[in-house]
Amino acid sequence: MEIGILALQGSVSEHHMIFRKCGVAFHDVRLPKDLNGINGLVMPGGESTTLRKLLKNSGLWKELKKGTIPILGTCAGAVLLGNCDDDTLGLVNIDILRNAYGRQIDSFESEITLETDEFDGISKFPGVFIRAPQIEN
């Protein structure tokens, strides 16, 4: 089995890391020809308006809209798979509210303190709090 990772923008490197750690075969998808031979596609988080434009410009939008490839979308990927006021792929019957927790400009970083010994002595790390979408229905 081989999974494609949509590599136009967003959290691509984080998906590479996890797939390697799990021993999953994958390759990046940037053009329609990159869809050949994959059993599924992951659409990582990022910025949905930018991602939509890149998908359309690359020719991938038309291919994905056919609905012939299983797709897992996180954050911006989920926004584009579901139904919302924007132009979406509409492949998953869910209603998505973009920026449900505020505008992206309101995202921030803050230090998080862990009250556990489960992370090899790490007690603090920088947390990134984004204004994520919300699945409403």
Feature roles, as predicted:
Residues M1-K56, K62, D120:
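N-terminal beta1-alpha1 cap of cysteine-dependent amidohydrolase-like domains
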Residues A7-Q9, R30-P32, D95, A100, ...:
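Residues at the C-termini of beta-strands that transition into short coil/loop
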Residues S11-V12, R30-L31, C75-A78, Q134:
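Short, polar loop motifs at secondary-structure junctions
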Residues V12, L35, L80, L114, ...:
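Flexible, glycine-rich phosphate/dinucleotide-binding loops
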Residues G40, P70, P126-V128:
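Structural motif
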Residues E47-T113:
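Cysteine-nucleophile active-site neighborhood
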Residues N99-N137:
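Amide-donor transfer/coupling interface in amidating biosynthetic enzymes
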